[in-house]
Design a protein with these regions (language model features):
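N-terminal secretory signal peptides that target proteins for export/translocation
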Residues: 1-3
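Sec-dependent N-terminal signal peptides
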Residues: 5-14
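N-terminal secretory-pathway/extracellular module detecting exported/lumenal segments
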Residues: 19-75, 82-131
């Protein structure tokens, strides 16, 4: 195989891999007000990390002065998921306005038990499916 064909094959494989890692809807009933999407970040033994994207016209947040505000835009949250023990850890959250400007970045370090019929349970289930 000559070098040109090899480069084309490598490029095609990398393109397919990056396409397969696109955002997947969390549920079929995403609404106009709120839509959740999930994307695999990486795996470690027994755990997986996923990004969850929330798109909404009204995302609440606390500004630097402690005042509750709302923005139209998106929020990306990185989760560490322990599928064996039904726990999730929130690692980081990044809030963007509608023009993709970062409004707030927050880092966390806390594991939570997942309550039934919550967005946390949906993240756990979907995250463990893509493990």
């Amino acid at each position: 195989m000559n070098i040109k064909k090899f480069i084309v094959v490598v490029f095609l494989i990398l393109s397919i891999k990056s396409y397969s890692q696109s955002w997947s809807p969390m549920s079929a009933n995403n609404s106009i007000e709120k839509s959740y999407y999930i994307k695999k970040h990486n795996n470690s033994v027994g755990n997986t990390k996923v990004w969850v994207k929330l798109i909404s016209n009204r995302i609440p947040y606390i500004d630097n002065n402690g005042v509750k505000k709302y923005t139209s835009g998106s929020e990306l949250t990185l989760y560490n998921i322990d599928c064996n023990n039904s726990k999730i850890e929130i690692i980081k959250s990044i809030l963007y306005d509608s023009s993709k400007k970062v409004i707030k970045t927050t880092e966390y370090n806390n594991w939570i038990d997942v309550a039934p019929e919550t967005i946390s349970e949906a993240i756990l289930i979907k995250g463990c499916e893509i493990l």
